[in-house]
Design a protein with these regions (language model features):
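Central cavity-lining transmembrane alpha-helices of secondary-active solute carriers
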Residues: 42-60, 255-267
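A membrane-interface helix-boundary motif in multi-pass transporters
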Residues: 153-166, 360-378
Length: 403
């Protein structure tokens, strides 16, 4: 179907846009402009802080607007424009301002894509379609990382900026090719069709009165506190070993992880209804904790690459399960997107704190101490998820699968 292909293309092209420059910015600033780890970690955190402040308002905006395609297109252009300004003005304050704008605009992507998906496919097909979304997203990330690695060998780290601009144009074409009249507005909000507005809980009641949603937000924050800084730290170690090959090696790390994420996302789409969400999410925490330990075993670039590939398991499971669990917890409330934005705010808090804290630990205690600390936080998050979170999959689906 046309709308399915358009949604595939949107997730593919948006993959390189939704996170801005990500770890490539760390390599670019370190290798080309001589920034230190603390300064690099700080500007990465600025994008995270801007994103977390904008996440909940962005979710509320997506709930309230019907023009979700236009909102997503504007956000993609804003992120691309902010990132493309960095090579022109590479000083601290211009880079910080660009990261601020990019982080705020990127807050729109997760709730907008989830809302469009739910509005197009409905609740029954949402798990399968979300797994497919994430598979295409990871395929796009793998393509972008491979292209960035190849282009950087010829043109240097500056190549990633041109690539981001091209992917932004692709995402613009994709989102505008989704038929606007195919998106059901009530479904896109997670609202029961035909339910009077007065019968809905308020957004505030949905966010604060749902203990499972609050517990999930805390676990998400810990997951990203443990995970967000790992790839930038690996990129810094690779750049220190060989400045000319740092970006290319980082791209190999990303490609390997993204290729693993594709089958993980497909697994979630195919089996999360039958197996339940909880065991899959716990597996993601376990692999993340193991990575933190394994990074300290050797400094060899190829070892770092192999360990980073394991990110594909944890992040692949997390990325696909995240909107599914929020949809489970907010079913029928009409506030799916603001809830998704609020939990993504917790995610942003964890990611921003991760980059800032890990940078400081590296400066004062070294890379191994930072990796071990991040791995320990992942183990703590897994324990809390096991203790606090119920199984959110429909109980009937689990019973049918098990019986």
């Amino acid at each position: 179907m046309r709308r399915d292909r358009a949604l595939d293309a949107l997730n593919f092209f948006l993959a390189d846009v939704r996170d801005g420059l990500g770890p490539y910015l760390a390599v670019y600033l370190l290798a080309v402009h001589g920034w230190d780890q603390a300064g690099t970690g700080l500007v990465l955190s600025i994008a995270g802080i801007a994103g977390l402040l904008a996440q909940t308002p962005a979710g509320a905006l997506v709930d309230g607007l019907r023009a979700r395609r236009g909102l997503l297109a504007l956000a993609a252009m804003a992120v691309a424009g902010a990132c493309l300004a960095i090579p022109l003005w590479p000083g601290f304050w211009p880079v910080a301002a660009a990261q601020l704008a990019s982080g705020a605009a990127s807050a729109v992507f997760a709730p907008a894509v989830a809302a469009i998906t739910l509005g197009l496919c409905g609740r029954a097909a949402f798990t399968r379609r979300t797994g497919r979304n994430e598979a295409w997203n990871h395929a796009g990330n793998a393509f972008a990382a491979a292209a960035a690695g190849g282009l950087s060998l010829w043109y240097g780290p500056i190549a990633v900026f041109a690539l981001l601009g091209a992917m932004a144009l692709g995402s613009l074409a994709a989102v505008l090719s989704i038929p606007a009249d195919a998106i059901d507005n009530d479904l896109a909000r997670g609202r029961k069709v035909g339910l009077p507005t007065a019968a809905q809980p308020s957004a505030w009641a949905t966010l604060t009165g749902n203990r499972a949603l609050l517990a999930f937000a805390a676990c998400v924050a810990l997951f990203h506190f443990a995970n967000a800084a790992m790839l930038p730290l690996v990129g810094q170690k690779l750049a220190q070993q060989d400045l000319n090959r740092g970006t290319a090696m980082l791209s190999l790390c990303i490609v390997g992880a993204q290729l693993v994420m594709v089958p993980m996302a497909m697994l979630v789409g195919a089996r999360a209804d039958a197996w339940g969400r909880k065991p899959l999410f716990l597996a993601g925490f376990a692999v993340l904790a193991l990575r933190g330990v394994l990074y300290t075993a050797a400094d060899d670039a190829w070892w770092l690459l192999v360990v980073q590939t394991m990110d594909g398991v944890g992040a692949g499971l997390f990325g696909a399960l995240f909107p599914i669990i929020v949809a489970d917890l907010t079913r029928g409330s009409g506030h799916f997107n603001v809830s998704l934005g609020a939990v993504a705010t917790a995610q942003g808090i964890g990611a921003a704190a991760s980059n800032a804290a890990a940078g400081l630990v590296v400066v004062h205690a070294g890379y191994d101490a930072a990796f071990l600390a991040l791995g320990g936080l992942a183990a703590l998050g897994g324990l809390l998820f096991w203790w606090l979170m119920p199984e959110t999959a429909a109980s009937s689906a689990v019973r049918v699968a098990s019986g």
